Amino acid sequence: MGSATREARARSVSALAGLGSKADLATAEDLFAAGRVVADSVQLRAVLSDPAADRSGKDVLVKRVFGALSAPAVELLGVIAGERWSGQDDVLDAIEELGIRSIAASAPRTVDIPAELLAFGGAVTSDAELELALRSKLADPSAKAALVERLLVGKAAGQTVAITRQLVLQPRGRSVRQALREAARIVAAQDGQTIATVVTATPLPAAQAERLRASLAAKYGDLKLNQVVDPSILGGMRVQIGGDVIDGSVSSRLSKLRLQLAG
């Protein structure tokens, strides 16, 4: 992420915070729809990401193209358009992120959106037929969205369904699981949390998982555990928190031992 984008992103997130309760699920749906329009228009994408373009002109363009959307969504799109971004994809990232954050900010505290997103990502990865159906470039995006709704409506929160539907409608080169992980990270960040992905050969007992969470939280702050079972690591565990990886898996230790013996 370039420095310009990093600063623009921070200001955009701050603008969202300034809206308070005005930003909600409806705002997110409008932002997602706007993001798809921007993604489909080379000209619009180029103008909105052009640092040399007149800022007031961009604002007029946003209101002309997206004026029918809710006022909070139009305001946030205006903020994004007025910022300086490192590239066109960063504009799309920002629109999607503010949509996801709008959902997270307005969701009831009883709804665990990251857990539901990550659980669905795991289900997709473990079902080759489902993964193919959702990642196929030949499949109609609206059919993918309908499939997501059939699978999740009534089983997951409406907020989770909305985010997942957006990700399959506009994958932008990401795998379903990759997109869901990033969305879960954004939701957690909106709530002031970090996600720690813990890979073990067998499921961790609840008490052990809580001790691990508390231990990691002492160093990394408030966090949520994303538990992944992968028998191929043989034993031990591998923990990833952002860019930090703590690999204590048996498979990793065996690999290092083989390298030492070969040397």
From Swiss-Prot:
What protein is this chain from?
A: ATP synthase subunit delta
Q: How does it sit in the membrane?
A: Peripheral membrane protein
This entry carries the following GO cellular component terms, namely: plasma membrane; proton-transporting ATP synthase complex
Question: What is the top-level taxon of the source organism?
Answer: Bacteria
Describe its assembly: F-type ATPases have 2 components, F(1) - the catalytic core - and F(0) - the membrane proton channel. F(1) has five subunits: alpha(3), beta(3), gamma(1), delta(1), epsilon(1). F(0) has three main subunits: a(1), b(2) and c(10-14). The alpha and beta chains form an alternating ring which encloses part of the gamma chain. F(1) is attached to F(0) by a central stalk formed by the gamma and epsilon chains, while a peripheral stalk is formed by the delta and b chains.
**A single GO molecular function, which one?**
proton-transporting ATP synthase activity, rotational mechanism
Q: What is its main location?
A: membrane
Family matches, as InterPro entries: ATPase_OSCP/d_CS (IPR020781), ATPase_OSCP/dsu (IPR000711)
| UniProt subcellular location | Cell membrane
Check the record and name the PANTHER family matching this protein: ATP SYNTHASE DELTA CHAIN (PTHR11910)
Query: Family per UniProt?
Result: Belongs to the ATPase delta chain family.
Keywords tagged on the record: ATP synthesis, Cell membrane, CF(1), Hydrogen ion transport, Ion transport, Membrane, Transport
What's its job?
F(1)F(0) ATP synthase produces ATP from ADP in the presence of a proton or sodium gradient. F-type ATPases consist of two structural domains, F(1) containing the extramembraneous catalytic core and F(0) containing the membrane proton channel, linked together by a central stalk and a peripheral stalk. During catalysis, ATP synthesis in the catalytic domain of F(1) is coupled via a rotary mechanism of the central stalk subunits to proton translocation.
